Amino acid sequence: MELLSKFKEDLLCSLDAKEKSRFKCVKHKHQHPHLHPECKFCKNIKEKKDILFENDHIVVMFGRPHHKGHIVVMPKVHEEDLLKLHEKTLDSFLNDTVKVMKALGKAIKPDLYNLEYLDNWDHHIHWNIYPRFKSDPDYGNPPVIPDKNKKFKPKLLSTQEKDIFYRQIKRMKAGLW
């Protein structure tokens, strides 16, 4: 049985590689489409670092806290073009982003959200979700992102807000909404 399972894995990997040959698979010594060795998001996914939620298709993690509740949602596979995502992954990417926004909304009650989809900074498809509050100095404008090399005062969720958010994420994981 183990031999059959290994054969199936190798065959699927091989077929995948022929279809999307891009990244070297360390285990099978051929091109592999799943994770890019130079991508910081792929490294976090591989190491299970800072992940708040994951399913078969996406991962969710906190972003840089220059805006309170900044969340990043991304596919588990490394893809640089939204139009090339597999239909199931795209569906999860879009629908689960909305669910994460709802969970965050119950925790911190923002007035609105700004969503950013940028291809020019980190070449792994992802949404930046910025909860926005009328009290923000730049409310009504796109989020101001501090220079990567400059320090900023982190805007973190309170313990109570985190607890509410995590409870909502657990409900999401359990398929309760």
Show where each model-derived region lies.
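HIT superfamily nucleotide-processing domains
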Residues: 1-177
